[in-house]
Structure formats: structure tokens, C-alpha cells
UniProtKB/Swiss-Prot annotation:
UniProt-annotated location(s): Membrane; Host cytoplasm
Keywords: Host cytoplasm, Membrane, Transmembrane, Transmembrane helix, Virulence
Domain of life, per lineage: Bacteria
Entry's induction text: Expressed during normal cell growth and in bacteria growing in a human cell line (at protein level). Transcription activated by SlyA, which is dependent on PhoP.
Presence of keyword Thylakoid: no
Disruption phenotype: No visible phenotype in a 12 hour, calf ligated ileal loop infection model. No bacterial growth phenotype; bacteria no longer induce IL-10 induction in human B cell lines. Bacteria grow slightly less well in human cell lines 24 hours post-infection. Deletion leads to greatly decreased phosphorylation of STAT3 in infected human cells. In mouse infections (C57BL/6 and CBA/J mice) deletion mutant bacteria are less virulent and less competitive with wild-type bacteria, mice have a reduced bacterial burden following intraperitoneal or oral infection, while mouse STAT3 is less phosphorylated.
Gene Ontology annotations for the cellular component aspect, listed alphabetically: host cell cytoplasm; membrane
Subunit structure: Interacts with host (human) STAT3.
Annotated transmembrane regions: 4-24
Protein name per the record: Salmonella anti-inflammatory response activator
Coiled coil residues, start to end: none
Membrane topology: Single-pass membrane protein
Species of the source: Salmonella typhimurium (strain 14028s / SGSC 2262)
Note in the entry: Encoded by the Gifsy-1 prophage. Also called pagJ, but this gene name had been previously given to a different gene (AC O30647).
Length: 181
């Protein structure tokens, strides 16, 4: 009887955590990424929202039909300014600064930035569609000196975590306003 009660508590607690973290997940997958003519560095990607494929262009809104949670994905924005994506040290430093100083969730909206040079061919990034959960995850990454955001495999993370990547969250007042280059 005690075992049943223990399992029941674990299931309820797990459901509470899942609800608290937003419930929905979306995955950015780089395997089908191709060049785009939209802008010199723009790219397109595939995104899965709860296993439903969605095609991404330079600026795409992802909306969960059964909730008010929403994400805007902005591809190929280099961080920091005037730093090439090949400059891993400067790139990581800029990412950490922006995560620490600039990211602000707006209600249930999350903004993502990224560059195709960051995700390896077979890597993908899955994040909860929840500003609070995303903020905590990004802040924990930014404060971990052993886990740089270059997308390299040098960062050792538990098997339950996703590979490192350079995609970060970024708040903007308007979805039409792209970050300054």
C-alpha cells in the first residue's frame, strides 16, 4: 500500500512540475536547415511543436492552439555585435552577457535568437514554451563556466539534457523589430 501511495505522489508531483514548466515543448532541428535568399545570413529550419512539424523562415511565430503560450523564432542573429560567429570566446561572452542583462519575458511570449553556425548538423534544441522556465534554464547555462554556448560537444551535460547550442531568448517590444547587428 505504501508503495502505491509513493508512486501516486511521484506521478502527481511530476504532473505538477510539467504544468509549472509550461507543459508544451518545441524542438529546433538543424538537420533540414538550408540557405535562404531572405538575407545574406538568413536560414530556414524545421521546428516541432509537440511533435507537429512547423516550417520556420527568418521570422516565425509558433503558437500552441490549446494555450496562450507563444514563441517567436528569429534565425541567424549574431551575438555580440561586430563579433563573428567563428570567434567562439567572444560569441560565448556576448551570449552570456545578453542572457544575464537583456532577456526579459513578456507574459507568455518568448523570443529566440540563433545562428545556423551554432547548432551542429545532428543537434537539436528542445525548450519548454514557458518564459519562467526558459529564463531559469538560460540563466543556469550562462552562470556555468564549464558549459559554453558554442554548440560544441565539449560541454558535458546529463543525458536528460539537450546538447548545448547558441540559441538564446530575447525580449522585443514588437515581433517585427529585429535586433541590431
Amino acid at each position: 500500500m505504501m508503495r502505491f501511495v509513493y508512486i501516486y505522489i511521484l506521478v502527481i508531483y511530476g504532473s505538477y512540475l510539467w504544468f509549472s514548466l509550461g507543459g508544451n515543448m518545441f524542438t529546433i532541428n538543424s538537420t533540414n536547415r538550408v540557405a535562404s535568399t531572405i538575407a545574406p545570413y538568413a536560414c530556414v529550419s524545421d521546428v516541432n511543436l509537440e511533435d507537429k512539424a512547423t516550417f520556420l523562415d527568418e521570422h516565425t511565430s509558433i503558437h500552441a492552439n490549446d494555450s496562450s503560450l507563444q514563441c517567436f523564432v528569429l534565425n541567424d542573429q549574431h551575438v555580440p555585435q561586430n563579433t563573428l560567429a567563428t570567434d567562439v570566446e567572444g560569441y560565448n561572452r556576448g551570449l552570456q552577457e545578453r542572457i544575464s542583462l537583456e532577456y526579459q519575458p513578456l507574459e507568455s511570449i518568448v523570443f529566440l535568437l540563433g545562428t545556423p553556425a551554432v547548432l551542429e548538423t545532428k543537434e537539436s534544441l528542445s525548450l519548454p514554451v514557458s518564459p519562467d522556465a526558459l529564463t531559469q534554464k538560460l540563466l543556469s547555462i550562462s552562470s556555468n563556466d564549464e558549459c559554453k554556448l558554442s554548440g560544441s560537444t565539449s560541454c558535458t551535460t546529463p543525458a536528460s539534457h539537450n546538447p548545448p547550442s547558441g540559441y538564446i531568448a530575447q525580449y522585443r517590444h514588437s515581433a517585427e523589430v529585429f535586433p541590431d547587428e
